[in-house]
């Protein structure tokens, strides 16, 4: 038996999963929460700042791995052949000449700018817009061509530029920047020095403007035109070569071998983003749209190179050769908020209960139980009486919009309220909004000639809330496959580890043995689908109209209204 371990670094926690490479059996798993993040450290939500301390990653990873390894028998621990890594992204951090994340140094230990800038940190909206404008300068190369045409504040260079402008001490100490999904494999293999790091194709292609057609990263002149401060502090190019995640970055270094009780022969595979590896763990085949659903969504589709050709798909988060499966084009999209929208509504409704608990401590336990039941009760109530004829129309931009056409200035909108709108109806409007966002992504692909043969959903919401998934199915008006595994991203990371360790010859072969099954296929309900179609058209009308209110101040609104934005009441 050969065993591979997948590490999945999420927004709140890290998961370790041990998998039998021959059968795909999930042998042992452990989730460890980030302690500082749980306390809200280094974050400023009103200003869209979300940072992770590297010690959160190190401590939680070590605890999760040790827990999993303790669960294995002595003989099984001897059969661990590889460790694979996925993470959120773009989640970069500044490192010094020795490869240490700056926040690991005493003088930067409490400086959020010296930490990992989490994917959902939107402090760099202006920098992202500047990158987009520069890419679209007439007569110059459009380096946004293969990342959907718009650069996002959730991505690598925007975050680097923002921190570099804001914090001169960090800018001077940073020898380079590294994505979380590249840093963890480098840490485990002892290859963290900037010149030793093997940069992943996934993160470089989707978030860093890296592409083969212009020889890697944009030229130094591009960054001079953007802001000379980048080249003043960072050596160009930051990196040149990139590697697919099925290739090893090295083996377990002596320090981590000793800490974990594993041999130094354990192979460390290349890193990639969580949802890309999640699609592999789900067993996705070409032209399957895989929705990884959690606090937000990431939507992944792979297509063969011939079918994509030289087409540049607009409005998405990139198309990258080998970002998901080697020798296929990986296309990424996503919604900036999904589960987070439901959680927001739960907090709104729960606020009076929190005040009541503070005033009456004897009721605290009972109120806490009631708070946990808020969303399940709302879901059940709306499912019994969907009331689509009186459903509020909601725009799902509560955390901006990722796809189509990234724009983090956008805000959520709730419309069509009246005095009869009750809590279940409003919650139903939020459910419909997240489903409409999913359909907008599907259409972003199909309207540009990228076929979507089937749709798959994975993650906790996908498996545990059939009401929400059925709404998505009805809105998409096509079957929706629910993937069985609760931990597809970690499973995908384990699959890449198995290939890097030569337990399988390639990713498709490993998927046949190790990928998750589909546990359920939902079918659209014709009557509901027809009513949702009408609501979706209103969603599109509101989207076009509302977007004009969130344009940058320097951008005038169109003088003539877009015809499809005409609202009828």
Swiss-Prot record:
Spell out the molecular function terms from Gene Ontology. Answer: ATP binding; D-ribulokinase activity; ribulokinase activity
As recorded in UniProt, its EC number(s) are 2.7.1.16
Which Gene3D superfamilies does the UniProt entry name for this protein? 1.20.58.2240, 3.30.420.40
Source domain of life: Bacteria
Q: In which pathway does it act?
A: Carbohydrate degradation; L-arabinose degradation via L-ribulose; D-xylulose 5-phosphate from L-arabinose (bacterial route): step 2/3
Q: What class of enzyme is it?
A: transferase
Name a single GO cellular component.
Answer: cytoplasm
Keywords from UniProt, A to Z, are:
Arabinose catabolism, ATP-binding, Carbohydrate metabolism, Kinase, Nucleotide-binding, Transferase
Q: Please list the GO biological process terms of this entry.
A: L-arabinose catabolic process to xylulose 5-phosphate
Q: Which reaction does it catalyse?
A: D-ribulose + ATP = D-ribulose 5-phosphate + ADP + H(+); L-ribulose + ATP = L-ribulose 5-phosphate + ADP + H(+)
Q: Which Pfam families match?
A: FGGY_C
Family stated for the protein in its record: Belongs to the ribulokinase family.
In Swiss-Prot or TrEMBL terms, this protein is called: Ribulokinase
């Amino acid at each position: 038996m050969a065993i591979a371990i997948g590490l999945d670094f999420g927004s709140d926690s890290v998961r370790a999963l041990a998998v039998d490479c021959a059968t795909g059996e999930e042998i042992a798993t452990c989730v460890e929460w980030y302690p500082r993040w749980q306390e809200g450290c280094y974050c400023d939500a009103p200003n869209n700042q979300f940072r992770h301390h590297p010690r959160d990653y190190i401590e939680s990873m070590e605890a999760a791995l040790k827990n999993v390894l303790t669960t294995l028998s002595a003989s099984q621990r001897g059969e661990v052949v590889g460790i694979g890594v996925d993470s959120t992204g773009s989640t970069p951090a500044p490192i010094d000449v020795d490869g240490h994340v700056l926040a690991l140094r005493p003088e930067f230990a409490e400086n959020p700018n010296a930490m990992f800038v989490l994917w959902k940190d939107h402090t760099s909206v202006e920098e992202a817009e500047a990158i987009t404008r520069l890419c679209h300068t007439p007569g110059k190369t459009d380096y946004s061509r293969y990342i959907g045409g718009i650069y996002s504040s959730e991505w690598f260079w925007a975050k680097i530029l923002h921190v570099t402008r804001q914090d001169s001490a960090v800018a001077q100490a940073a020898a380079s920047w590294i994505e979380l999904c590249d840093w963890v494999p480098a840490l485990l293999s002892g290859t963290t020095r900037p010149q030793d790091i093997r940069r992943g194709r996934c993160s470089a292609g989707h978030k860093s403007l890296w592409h083969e057609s212009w020889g890697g990263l944009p030229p130094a002149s591009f960054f001079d035109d953007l802001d000379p401060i980048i080249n003043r502090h960072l050596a160009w190019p930051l990196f040149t070569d990139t590697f697919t995640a099925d290739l090893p970055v090295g083996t377990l270094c002596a320090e981590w071998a000793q800490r974990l009780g594993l041999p130094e022969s354990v192979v460390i595979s290349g890193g990639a983003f969580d949802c890309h590896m999640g699609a592999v763990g789900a067993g996705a085949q070409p032209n399957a749209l895989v929705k990884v659903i959690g606090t937000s969504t990431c939507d992944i589709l792979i297509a063969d190179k011939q079918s994509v050709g030289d087409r540049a798909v607009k409005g998405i988060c990139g198309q990258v050769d080998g970002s998901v499966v080697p020798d296929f084009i990986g296309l990424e999209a996503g919604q900036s908020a999904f589960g987070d929208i439901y959680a927001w509504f739960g907090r709104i409704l729960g606020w009076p209960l929190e005040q009541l608990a503070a005033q009456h401590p004897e009721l605290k336990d009972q109120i806490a139980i009631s708070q946990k039941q808020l969303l399940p009760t709302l879901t059940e109530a709306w499912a019994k009486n969907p009331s689509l004829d009186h459903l509020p129309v909601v725009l799902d931009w509560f955390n901006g919009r990722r796809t189509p056409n990234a724009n983090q200035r956008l805000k959520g909108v709730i419309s069509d309220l009246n005095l009869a709108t009750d809590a279940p109806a409003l919650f139903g409007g939020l459910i419909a909004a997240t489903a409409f966002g999913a359909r907008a992504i599907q259409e972003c692909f199909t309207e540009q000639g990228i076929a979507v043969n089937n749709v798959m959903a994975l993650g906790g919401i996908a498996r545990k809330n059939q009401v929400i998934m059925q709404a998505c199915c009805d809105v998409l008006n096509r079957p929706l496959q629910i993937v069985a595994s609760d931990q597809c991203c970690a499973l995908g990371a384990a699959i890449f580890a198995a290939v890097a360790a030569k337990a399988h010859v390639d990713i498709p072969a490993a998927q046949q043995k190790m990928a998750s099954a589909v546990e359920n296929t939902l079918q659209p309900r014709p009557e509901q689908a027809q009513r949702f179609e009408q609501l979706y058209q209103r969603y599109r009308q509101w989207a076009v109209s509302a977007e004009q209110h969130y344009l940058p101040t320097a951008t005038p609104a169109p003088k003539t209204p877009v015809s499809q934005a005409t609202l009828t009441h």
